[in-house]
Structure formats: C-alpha cells, structure tokens
From Swiss-Prot:
PANTHER family: PEPTIDYL-TRNA HYDROLASE (PTHR17224:SF1)
Keyword field: Cytoplasm, Hydrolase, RNA-binding, tRNA-binding
Gene3D superfamilies in alphabetical order: Peptidyl-tRNA hydrolase
Binding-site list for tRNA: 14, 64, 66, 112
Organism: Listeria monocytogenes serotype 4a (strain HCC23)
Similarity comment text for this entry: Belongs to the PTH family.
Protein name: Peptidyl-tRNA hydrolase
C-alpha cells in the first residue's frame, strides 16, 4: 500500500491556483480510476485506487498548505505505511511551468507545506514529485502562488499534471528510483 499526498489549500477560491497543483494531480488519478473522495477523520479527503494490484491511498489535506504534516503523519500511522511508500506532490517555483522533477529526498526548499511534513514525519528522506509553476517576474510570491494559471500556461500545466499522474501509476509496479530516472529525463 502506498500513500500519495497532493498538497494544496481547501476551498473553491484556491481550486485552480498554482499552489494547488498537488491537489490537481491526485484529482486526476481519482478521475482516471473513477473513485470518490471521502472525508477522512485525519483532516483530509481520501480516495483509494488500485493500480496493477497495488492499493494507493490518495490524500488532499484540508489543513491548509502550511499544516499539511498534521494530516499526513496520522494517515501514515493509521494505515501503517512506511515513509518509503509515501509520495508528496507539490508546486515548485524553481521549475518552469510544465516541468516535473522526482526526488527521493531533500530539504523543504522554502516550501511551507514540505516544512510541515518534514517536521511531522521527522525525516527529509521521502519521495516527492515537484511540479513546476515558475517564479513571478516581480511582486510577492504569495500572491503569485495563490493566483490561477493564465490561459497561455494551461496546456503546459495540464501536461505536467498528466505526466505526474502517469509517474505515480508507474510507481505502483516499479521502484521509485526507476520511475524517477524515467521521468526526470523527459
């Protein structure tokens, strides 16, 4: 069993924002597998998919981005999922829109959702998929990440969401390092 957490903020006003690209990836997986979302007792929404016989628990924390670890850690404990079977999907300002990067470990890189998860799981050594949203040319980052993708960027972000979902489906049957090597070359 694997836990796939997409990071974002709950609520209609954040639904299509750059910061919610993690939610968009797990929503894509839920859509592909036609599985419903259910409210979890751990302050998140969960959906279960089966890929190649492997059960994957999808989660969207409802804690708001900066407290994502408050949802992830209890779910790991409840389902007895070890850290090596967890994947966190989140937005990355340092990658261009449409690019994805898979990593097995690393720092939070200034991302508050990742800081919260690292604090709660007490390690930086877990799988992650970073989805590029680019940096603003000027202005505050907070307004930028809480803004929607402009029309010109939508084809690139849709492709990145689909590629991220493909990588997660591959991970059901393939070690993460192999999935990482495959998708980081594209």
């Amino acid at each position: 069993m694997k836990l796939i957490a997409g990071l974002g903020n709950p609520g209609k006003k954040y639904e299509r924002t750059r910061h919610n690209v993690g939610f968009m990836v797990v929503d894509e997986l839920s859509f592909r597998h036609q599985t419903p979302w259910k409210k979890s007792k751990f302050n998140g929404m969960t959906s279960e998919i089966i890929v190649g016989g492997e059960k994957m628990i999808l989660v969207k924390p409802l804690t708001f981005m900066n407290a994502s670890g408050e949802c992830i850690r209890p779910l790991m404990d409840y389902y007895n999922i070890p850290i090596e079977d967890v994947v966190i999907v989140y937005d990355d300002l340092d990658l261009p829109v449409g690019k994805i990067r898979l990593r097995q470990k690393g720092s939070a890189g200034g991302h508050n959702g990742m800081k919260s998860i690292i604090q709660h799981v007490k390690t930086q050594e877990f799988n992650r998929i970073r989805v590029g949203v680019s940096r603003p040319l000027k202005g505050e980052v907070i307004h930028y990440v809480l803004g929607d993708f402009p029309k010109a960027e939508q084809p690139d972000i849709i492709a990145a969401i689909q590629k991220s979902a493909d990588a997660i489906e591959d991970y059901a049957q393939t070690p993460f390092i192999e999935v990482m090597n495959k998708y980081n070359q594209k």
